[in-house]
From Swiss-Prot:
Keywords: ATP-binding, DNA-binding, Metal-binding, Nucleotide-binding, Repressor, Transcription, Transcription regulation, Zinc, Zinc-finger. The gene is nrdR. It comes from the Bacteria. Belongs to the NrdR family. Negatively regulates transcription of bacterial ribonucleotide reductase nrd genes and operons by binding to NrdR-boxes. One of its GO terms (molecular function) is ATP binding. This is Transcriptional repressor NrdR. Residues 49-139 form the ATP-cone domain. It holds the Pfam family ATP-cone. It comes from Bacillus velezensis (strain DSM 23117 / BGSC 10A6 / LMG 26770 / FZB42) (Bacillus amyloliquefaciens subsp. plantarum). GO terms for biological process: negative regulation of DNA-templated transcription. PANTHER family: TRANSCRIPTIONAL REPRESSOR NRDR. The keyword Cell membrane does not apply. Residues 1-21 are annotated as: Disordered. Its cofactor is Zn(2+).
Length: 152
């Protein structure tokens, strides 16, 4: 690792600790030549996870995009932000653990709806109405009936 002060190629590690929820390592280093101290971060390269949309369009998975949709569905509902963040983290982890580079958007949507139904039914119906593109009140009523059946 080159020293940012003198450009010498040698440094020694003084301290290492996990960072970014364990996804990287923070290292405190000291240059062997000028004794300048600096911090580096070591991070493994994550393979991108691609979401294949219904129309065949491919885009990189975004936990932030999923969280924004959930926040919108849970607006004015008693659902803590931390719960939604944890849900997004768990879904991403589960998708990455499948060991595939591409997933269908339908799978992601179903995973979100399964979890959201257990957290808040009103938010679930809001999310489902947008995700499944309810065309009229009858489709909405059918979804509510399915939700009631699942509870029993």
């Amino acid at each position: 690792m080159k020293c940012p002060s003198c450009q010498h190629n040698g440094s020694r590690v003084l301290d290492s600790r996990p960072a970014d929820e364990g996804k990287s390592i923070r290292r405190r280093r000291e240059c062997e030549a000028c004794h300048y101290r600096f911090t580096t971060f070591e991070k493994f390269e994550e393979m991108p996870l691609i979401v294949v949309k219904k129309e065949g369009v491919r885009e990189e998975f975004s936990r932030e995009k999923m969280l924004r949709g959930l926040i919108k569905a849970c607006e004015k509902r008693p659902v803590p932000l931390k719960t939604l963040e944890d849900m997004c983290f768990d879904i991403e982890k589960e998708l990455r653990n499948q060991g595939v580079s591409e997933v269908k958007s339908e799978l992601v949507g179903e995973m979100v709806m399964d979890r959201l139904a257990k957290i808040d039914e009103v938010s679930y119906v809001r999310f489902a109405s947008v995700y499944r593109q309810f065309k009229d009140i009858n489709v909405f009523i059918d979804e509510l009936k399915d939700l009631i059946k699942k509870e029993r």
